[in-house]
Amino acid sequence: MAISQAKKNEIIKQYARHEGDTGSTEVQVAVLTADINEINVHMQEHRKDFHSQRGLMKKIGHRRNLLAYLRKTDVQRYRELIKSLGLRR
């Protein structure tokens, strides 16, 4: 259900601000978004999986907090990130 390590490394490489960057806000949000999308697919098939639903809500809340932090600190990076991830339609 969680994303594979190879996919995670690909996402990290795409959104990293410098080589070896795994903890920047952009990378964290991108990895969380991929996780959320995977869990969403699982939840459509398994509607009564309440443990996964709780995990999904926790990940969404964490992503929301990270996006709020990024918006507060650097609006330009925030706008670029939500545009590239397809959030906030």
UniProtKB/Swiss-Prot annotation:
Tree of life domain: Bacteria
UniProt keyword Transferase, yes or no: no
GO cellular component, one term: cytosolic small ribosomal subunit
Gene3D superfamilies: 6.10.250.3130, S15/NS1, RNA-binding
Annotated keywords: Ribonucleoprotein, Ribosomal protein, RNA-binding, rRNA-binding
Gene Ontology BP annotations: translation
Molecular function (Gene Ontology), one example: rRNA binding
UniProt function note: One of the primary rRNA binding proteins, it binds directly to 16S rRNA where it helps nucleate assembly of the platform of the 30S subunit by binding and bridging several RNA helices of the 16S rRNA.
Self-association state and partner proteins as the record states: Part of the 30S ribosomal subunit. Forms a bridge to the 50S subunit in the 70S ribosome, contacting the 23S rRNA.
Family named by the database record: Belongs to the universal ribosomal protein uS15 family.
Protein's name in the database: Small ribosomal subunit protein uS15
Annotated organism of origin: Levilactobacillus brevis (strain ATCC 367 / BCRC 12310 / CIP 105137 / JCM 1170 / LMG 11437 / NCIMB 947 / NCTC 947)
Gene that encodes it: rpsO
